[in-house]
C-alpha cells in the first residue's frame, strides 16, 4: 500500500480553521488543537446565547412597560395591562409596547386608559 500525501488537504483545512480563530488571543489563535477546541466552544456559546438574547430582550421589554405603566396610575401594573389587552383582544406585542413606552408615553397612557373603561 502506497503512502498518501495529504499535505494540501490538511493545510487547507487548518487554514480555514485558523481564519476563524484569527481574532482569538494567545495560543487559541496559533496552535491547531487549541484552535479546534476554541472553535467548538465559540460555536456552542453562540448557539446558546442566541436563545438567551431572546429571553433577555423580552425581560427588558417587560421592565420598560412596567416602569412606564406604574408611573401613570397608582394601582396599575404590567400584569393587569397585559391581562386587559388579552381581554380586549388587542394584538400588541411586548416589543411594540416597549417602543411606544419609550418614544411616546402619552400614547401608552391612552391605550391603558381605553382598556380600563
UniProtKB/Swiss-Prot annotation:
Which PROSITE patterns has this protein been placed in? RIBOSOMAL_L20
UniProt gene name: rpl20
Q: Which UniProt keywords apply?
A: Chloroplast, Plastid, Ribonucleoprotein, Ribosomal protein, RNA-binding, rRNA-binding
Q: Which HAMAP family match?
A: Ribosomal_bL20
A Pfam family of the record is: Ribosomal_L20
The answer to whether keyword Ribosomal protein applies is yes
Give the protein's function.
Binds directly to 23S ribosomal RNA and is necessary for the in vitro assembly process of the 50S ribosomal subunit. It is not involved in the protein synthesizing functions of that subunit.
Superkingdom of the source species: Eukaryota
Q: What InterPro entries does this protein's entry cite?
A: Ribosomal_bL20 (IPR005813), RIBOSOMAL_L20_CS (IPR049946), Ribosomal_protein_bL20_C (IPR035566)
Which Gene Ontology terms describe the biological processes this protein takes part in?
A: ribosomal large subunit assembly; translation
Protein name listed in UniProt: Large ribosomal subunit protein bL20c
Keyword Protein biosynthesis applies? no
One annotated Gene Ontology cellular component of this protein: chloroplast
Amino acid at each position: 500500500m502506497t503512502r498518501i500525501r495529504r499535505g494540501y488537504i490538511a493545510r487547507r483545512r487548518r487554514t480555514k480553521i485558523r481564519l476563524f480563530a484569527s481574532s482569538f488571543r494567545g495560543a487559541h489563535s496559533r496552535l491547531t488543537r487549541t484552535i479546534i477546541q476554541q472553535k467548538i466552544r465559540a460555536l456552542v456559546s453562540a448557539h446558546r446565547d442566541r436563545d438567551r438574547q431572546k429571553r433577555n430582550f423580552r425581560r427588558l421589554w417587560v421592565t420598560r412597560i412596567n416602569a412606564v405603566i406604574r408611573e401613570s396610575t397608582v394601582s396599575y401594573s404590567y400584569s393587569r395591562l397585559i391581562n386587559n389587552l388579552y381581554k380586549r383582544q388587542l394584538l400588541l406585542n411586548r416589543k411594540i409596547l416597549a417602543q411606544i413606552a419609550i418614544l411616546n408615553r402619552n400614547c401608552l397612557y391612552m391605550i391603558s386608559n381605553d382598556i380600563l373603561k
